[in-house]
Amino acid sequence: MSEKNAYAKSGVDVEAGYEVVERIKKHVARTERAGVMGVLGGFGGMFDLSKTGVKEPVLVSGTDGVGTKLMLAIKYDKHDTIGQDCVAMCVNDIIAAGAEPLYFLDYIATGKNNPVKLEEVVSGVAEGCVQAGVALIGGETAEMPGMYGEDDYDLAGFAVGVAEKSQIIDGSKVKEGDILLGLASSGIHSNGYSLVRRVFADYTGKELLPELEGKRLKDVLLEPTRIYVKAALPLIKEELVNGIGHITGGGFIENVPRMFADDLAAEIDEDKVPVLPIFKALEKYGDIKHEEMFEIFNMGVGLMLAVSPENVNRVKDLLDEPVYEIGRIIKKADDSVVIK
């Protein structure tokens, strides 16, 4: 008996793995950008930092996954957008530090290599990379029978970006009186899905809930996370923003205070927050306390900007989308986030 057959009997299909690599090449090619060196399949991805033109480069990295949103992708057998979620979770964190994302690597672990399904996943990763302007320069697909069920997989990513040292956003520039501007989210994004799945556990996903304005539940739940790179980069390069917050797990309460120093607080005008229909549905069907919603979800704001009052109009002019003036920075009294 050959070694190959012995490996196959253990549950690892090497030929399927080769097929996955061939299938994803065309998707990886879509993400090419200046600075990429080498070819897909090398032992390490390479990037020429000098091609960025940054004078005092500081590398900024981020890694994340998509949590149990994956379980809904598996349940509904829809795998072509979950990769965008993975990219978004990484690059949005990097942009919050004032960096331009450069390249991305993905990691997929599965119980059984399904080349068609995994191509769908990577096509979503590639789409996210295109939207973010990053190159997909490497990755790993691990077939792990016994660790995962045959239909199960996990997905994680790693992104690296570069910032001009003088343009790093670390919260130190945020000051009392700054205006908080919100950029709309596309939906739930990629956090809070353990609760989301509990709330809608008995639903098929095909339901047209009245709160969802004609959209099927599963389409709303799997709406991919918005990528904010192309919206935020021009603002960073013009040094128009003092702080950026990526509103992810922990909602407003956990993420907004990460934008500024400990002696400051954010005062949020709840009436100005563009709450999406899905959050109203979650609150209703999940019997979730209203104040807790802001501790879990983005509530319709995926990226928050702290901007000096004199720069607000310029920021709004540069952003080709609705911009929500949802609050301001105040001196801290008790809580770091005050929702009025």
Swiss-Prot record:
<dbReference type="InterPro" id="IPR036921">
    <property type="entry name" value="PurM-like_N_sf"/>
</dbReference>
<dbReference type="InterPro" id="IPR010918">
    <property type="entry name" value="PurM-like_C_dom"/>
</dbReference>
<dbReference type="Pfam" id="PF00586">
    <property type="entry name" value="AIRS"/>
</dbReference>
<keyword id="KW-0547">Nucleotide-binding</keyword>
<dbReference type="InterPro" id="IPR004733">
    <property type="entry name" value="PurM_cligase"/>
</dbReference>
<dbReference type="GO" id="GO:0006189">
    <property type="term" value="P:'de novo' IMP biosynthetic process"/>
</dbReference>
<dbReference type="Pfam" id="PF02769">
    <property type="entry name" value="AIRS_C"/>
</dbReference>
<dbReference type="GO" id="GO:0046084">
    <property type="term" value="P:adenine biosynthetic process"/>
</dbReference>
<keyword id="KW-0658">Purine biosynthesis</keyword>
<comment type="pathway">
    <text>Purine metabolism; IMP biosynthesis via de novo pathway; 5-amino-1-(5-phospho-D-ribosyl)imidazole from N(2)-formyl-N(1)-(5-phospho-D-ribosyl)glycinamide: step 2/2.</text>
</comment>
<dbReference type="GO" id="GO:0004637">
    <property type="term" value="F:phosphoribosylamine-glycine ligase activity"/>
</dbReference>
<comment type="similarity">
    <text>Belongs to the AIR synthase family.</text>
</comment>
<keyword id="KW-0436">Ligase</keyword>
<keyword id="KW-0963">Cytoplasm</keyword>
<dbReference type="GO" id="GO:0004641">
    <property type="term" value="F:phosphoribosylformylglycinamidine cyclo-ligase activity"/>
</dbReference>
<dbReference type="InterPro" id="IPR036676">
    <property type="entry name" value="PurM-like_C_sf"/>
</dbReference>
<dbReference type="GO" id="GO:0005524">
    <property type="term" value="F:ATP binding"/>
</dbReference>
<protein>
    <recommendedName>
        <fullName>Phosphoribosylformylglycinamidine cyclo-ligase</fullName>
        <ecNumber>6.3.3.1</ecNumber>
    </recommendedName>
</protein>
<dbReference type="GO" id="GO:0005829">
    <property type="term" value="C:cytosol"/>
</dbReference>
<keyword id="KW-0067">ATP-binding</keyword>
<dbReference type="InterPro" id="IPR016188">
    <property type="entry name" value="PurM-like_N"/>
</dbReference>
